[in-house]
A protein has these predicted regions:
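Helix C-cap/helix->beta junction micro-motif
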Residues: 25, 87-88, 118
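Conserved core segment of the aminotransferase class I/II
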Residues: 116-192
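Phosphate-binding glycine-rich loop
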Residues: 1-7
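Generic structural signal for small/hydrophobic residues in well-ordered secondary structure
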Residues: 8-9, 22, 60, 67, ...
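Short hydrophobic alpha-helical segments of the AMP-binding
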Residues: 1, 21-22, 85
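A short helix-loop-beta submotif of the ANL/AMP-binding
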Residues: 24-30
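Short beta->alpha connector loops at strand-helix junctions that form conserved
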Residues: 12, 31-36
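Active-site phosphate-binding strand-loop segment of PLP-dependent enzymes
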Residues: 34-106
Length: 200
């Protein structure tokens, strides 16, 4: 999705593997720091637009919900990110791997669901690995509504031979998503209780 020496924008603090992946693939990092105020992290949109407007910036890795700060971006925020990225011709890679691990009763908003602009200029990555503790199976899914972009993604996945799951990686997510809702509800309650306990 990018070429060597292009720049990838990330909103920090963020999952450290993003840094390794960007650097190891010969790209450069543009950090747009989140601001922490009144107990919450917010996007500095002036800074984000400055980074997106860099002529070498070609990709924004969006963490939604954000890891590690736990921020669930609202629809308006995601729409603004989408508009800025489209304006500056920057593709959005939305890492939504933590989407199921929200506060009980609180859902996240998928980036691609916000608008046509967001849908047509995004790649969404999801996986059962965090939610159902299946990381060892190395299974994930990539959702790309735009057919032209999907073709590029398919070519990249097959070129790098990462689209070859084993039989367990194909079956386990189906079982987890089809039969794990009750367990997931209990897990979310348990995790939220742990958080409350840690805050006391």
């Amino acid at each position: 999705m990018t070429t060597t020496a292009e720049k990838v924008v990330v909103m920090t603090p963020v999952y450290n593997i993003f840094f390794n992946s960007i650097i190891n693939n010969g790209r450069f990092i543009l950090e747009s720091p989140l601001h922490y105020e009144n107990g919450a992290y917010e996007i500095d949109f002036a800074d984000l637009e400055e980074k997106l407007s860099d002529p070498q910036a070609s990709l924004l890795i969006l963490c939604n919900p954000h890891n590690p700060v736990g921020k669930i971006w609202d629809r308006g925020t995601l729409a603004k990110i989408g508009e800025l990225c489209a304006k500056h011709h920057v593709l959005v890679l939305s890492d939504e791997i933590h989407c199921d691990l929200t506060k009980p009763g609180k859902d996240y908003v998928p980036f691609a669901s916000v608008s046509e602009t967001c849908r047509e200029n995004s790649i969404t990555c999801v996986a059962p690995t965090k939610t159902f503790n299946l990381a060892g199976l190395q299974t994930a899914a990539v959702i790309v509504p735009n057919p032209v972009l999907r073709h590029r993604v398919n070519r990249g996945l097959n070129t790098d031979e990462v689209a070859e799951p084993n039989v367990f990686a194909a079956i386990a997510p189906v079982a987890a998503f089809n039969h794990g809702a009750e367990w997931l509800d209990s897990l979310r309650e348990y995790l939220w209780e742990n958080r409350r306990y840690a805050e006391e």
